[in-house]
Each structure stands twice: as C-alpha cells, then as structure tokens.
Amino acid sequence: MKIKVITSYKPGTWGSFAKRGIHSMVEQFPPEVDIFLYCEEQQPKDVDDRITCVDLTQAETELFKFKDKYKDDPTANGKIKQIEGGVRRSPNLQGLDKDKDSFLWDAVRFANKVFCVVNAVRNSDGYDYVLWIDADTFTFRSVPLEFFSKLLPEETMLTYLGRENPTLGDGGVYPECGFVGYNLKHPETRNFIHDWERLYTPGDVFKILEW
C-alpha cells in the first residue's frame, strides 16, 4: 500500500505546534508513507527533507478566490451577524447552535482543508490512499504500515474517526475530521472530490444546512 499523507497549518503557527506534529510523522511513519505539507506562507526553513511542500496559493487559486469573496461576510465566517447582500443560514436549521456564532458555518476557515484534499487527490498517481492528518497531531511511537492498512480498508471510499455514542442517540453528529482517508481505488472517490470542490467554486456550499 502506498499512502500520501497530507496536512496544513494556519500561517504563523509553524513554530508553536505544526513543526512538532509534522516532524513526529517523519520520525514515526514508515517509508511507504510520503508526507506533503500545504503552505500558505513562505516555506519553513527548518522543514525536514522527507516532507514535500506545496504552495497552496499557487496550487489552488480557486480557494483564494472563494476566501477573498467571502472574507468580509461575517455569516460566511461562522458569525450570526448578517450584512446586506451577504449569505444566509438555511431557514430549515434546527438545534441549539442555529442562533449562535459557531464553527458549523465557518465556511471560509474550513475551505482550506477542502482544497488541500482536492489538490492531493488530483495529483496522486501511484498512490492507493490520500490521508489527511491535522498538523497538531503528535505521533508518539512508531506506526507500522500494517496499522495503516487496517485503518484504510480497500472496500470503503472514506475512512474517518467517528464519535458515535449510543447513549446520546445522535448518530455521531460531529465526527473527528483530523484523520480522514480517501481511497483512490474506489470508483466514486474522484466523483466525490469533484462534487466537494463544486460546493465552493460557485458558492453552493451556502445552500446546505451546515458549511
């Protein structure tokens, strides 16, 4: 199995946490795993040679068109405040968060991860899986390839860390998306990636319940 691990970090946080997490992957992941770092700022000078850096500003210009268009719209940034001509949350929303500031509607912030994954999947010849891991994840011991193989089965399109709690009966409303695998051998993965990107390029993401 050939795995392409991808991650990114918020500009200005390389020294505070991202370097530690990403370099722990270098130290603990097997050689069959390649590590790609998507950067929005100048490439860090102290990045390990095993890491391939991708300039996100050049690789995915559509991301920054989206962010520039909606950066001054508080609703698109998770706020309850609205502006004239701005986007609106769905009138069909239910639940306690619908009238509060919430990450559930911070489309501008979370668009970065979407376009990193889109770019990685579309530039993945020779790989079996693209695996997103948040940059603040610290790998504290060696991870054998067999462990990845168990987590990334061949028959599923996506793999993620669920938070299903039978006592809550909520169906696992908020999954942990700091670890998500995309099976490149599955026939629907690239269709999914295309549809995911299309939510952002024309702004259709604002038509769904949560962004």
Where are these regions (language model features)?
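GT-A fold catalytic core of metal-dependent nucleotide-sugar glycosyltransferases
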Residues: 105, 109-161
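Short beta-strand-to-loop element that shapes/binds the nucleotide-sugar donor at the catalytic cleft/hinge
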Residues: 149-150, 154-176, 181
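Catalytic core and acceptor-binding pocket of nucleotide-sugar-dependent glycosyltransferases
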Residues: 179-211
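N-terminal anchoring/stem segment of glycosyltransferases
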Residues: 1-99, 122-127, 184
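Conserved glycosyltransferase catalytic-site signature
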Residues: 114, 136, 177, 210-211
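Short catalytic/ligand-binding loop motif for oxyanion handling, primarily in non-cytosolic enzymes
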Residues: 14, 44-47, 62-63, 139-142, ...
